[in-house]
């Protein structure tokens, strides 16, 4: 992603065919096998590093442990370096499924790497780390504070970054404005390189309060969602309203701006 030839985001993933962590008895550790041939690899977190498994030191009735940053992934196992196969207590010597998607600048070289970043382009689930850590602390003190309240509010240490579901390396510093150039490479054999330019739109919200006051606020382009199955790019402009303002109606206006030109347009066209 770039703006006027200035790079904003540059992310490269490496995809392989199926591969396994093979047990090397002479070294008492696992190493990744060579990948098998593959015509296509789905871009899914299930194929990125992560997963769940049993710790050999746990009681037989213990619940499985999960990789906090990607519980549905492949290649991670709980406990000692030799690990156990997810869903069963298989022999150490059995091959263990490895990840097929990794960061090009940080290939996996060892098993059970707790700090390895799950590789993907999709949103991060709210109950995955590091997003979950931003949700705050919900303990007995929090429950007591809201005991007589009509609704439960966020914790005092809640961080609004919790609402950001994009991977950290896909967040544009300073935000988007439109007119950025989007380039995708290597996703399709039939179209090795794809390029699109985001529209430069000014969208403004006219908010009317219950007391008859009006307030005009520019909306921000804050989300770009790429649907590779449908070959569509979805854009979201967002506005946050203060509940205390008692907003009863919102009208939206938009106008296309020349590429590379900032500032508000002189006239608006209503769209809602």
Model-derived features with residue positions:
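Extended intrinsically disordered or low-complexity segments
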Residues: 1-272
